[in-house]
C-alpha cells in the first residue's frame, strides 16, 4: 500500500517536542487553566485566555496541519462548528455550489441557517461531472463545497478537476473539501489544489468514539486569520481534555486506517458476491463508477461502505436489528463497527423527495467497518442478511 512518506513518524512527533514543556514531558500535558498570568499588563507570555488559545490545543493543531501537509489548522468544538466558521466567511448575496450528496447536517446548516438567516444562495449539483459545476457557477459564486467520497452514497469527485474548473471561472472562488471519510492518511485535498479542508475529528481522526470536534485546515494566511477571529468571537472552542484525547488518537491513525481498509475491502467483496444485495458502493472496488478517479487521487480507502438490500424498509429494519457485532448507531470512524439506515437516521433531515432523487432509499444501508476480527464481521453480516431476507 503506497502511503504519504513519513506519515506515522509525523503523527507521533510533530508538535510533541518535550523541550517545549518545563519538565520535558514526552506526552504533552493537559493544560486546564482558563487564564494565564501576564508579566506586565498586555504582555502575555504565550496565551492570555483559553478561548483565544491553549497549549494543548496548539499541539493538536500543529500535528493536524502537518498531517494534511498544510500551514494552518484551527480546531473547533464540533464538525458543524467548523462548517459554520467557514461559511461565515461569505457575505449576504454570495452563492455556494454544493455537491448534492453531503452529510445531512451540512445540508441542514446551509439550507436552514445560512440561506434564510444570512442571505446566501445555494445550488446543489452532482459534482462527479464537472460540466455540472461549469453550468452552476454564477457571477456571485464564492465557494464550492463537497465531500469525496460523499456521505452516504460514496460518490467520488475529481478534486483537481473541480479546482481547475472553479478557478478558471473565478480565481477567488474558495474550494472546500470535507475529508472526513478519508482522513489525511489516505487523501490530501490541499495537495490537489483545494483551498480548505474540513474534518469532523469525531470520526477517523479521533477514532475512539469519545470526542466531538471539528477542524479547518488551510494554506491561506488570510483565511486562517478569519478562522481565528471567528472562533474568538463566537467561542466554539474544544476542551483541552478533548484535544488531549484526539492528539493521542492521532498516534495510531496510520495503523487504524490500514486495518479499516483491509477489513472493509474484504467486507465489500463479500457483499458484492451476496445474492441478498442489489449493489455495493465502495470506491476501492473496480465496479464503483468513479473507481479510476478514486485510485488517482487517494492512497487507499476507509471503512465506509454503503449497499442496497434486496428489499424495502421492513427488510432493512430486520437486518439492522439482527446484527450482533455491528452496532446500530449513527456516526462512523471508530474502532468499533457501526451500521445505520440513512433515510431515517443520519439523512432524515434531507427532504424526502430529494432523498429519492439521490438514491437514499429505505433499502440503503451504511456501515462503518471497524477493526474487529474480519471473520466475525463477515459472519455477523451473513447471519443478519439471512434473517432479514430468508429466501433469494
Curated annotation (Swiss-Prot):
Short name of one Pfam family: Cys_Met_Meta_PP
Keyword Transmembrane helix: no
Cofactor: pyridoxal 5'-phosphate
Reaction catalysis annotation: L,L-cystathionine + H2O = 2-oxobutanoate + L-cysteine + NH4(+)
One annotated GO molecular function: cystathionine gamma-lyase activity
Protein keywords: Amino-acid biosynthesis, Cysteine biosynthesis, Cytoplasm, Lyase, Pyridoxal phosphate
Ranges for region Disordered: 32-55
GO cellular component: cytoplasm; endoplasmic reticulum
UniProt similarity note: Belongs to the trans-sulfuration enzymes family.
Protein name: Putative cystathionine gamma-lyase 2
Source organism of this protein record: Caenorhabditis elegans
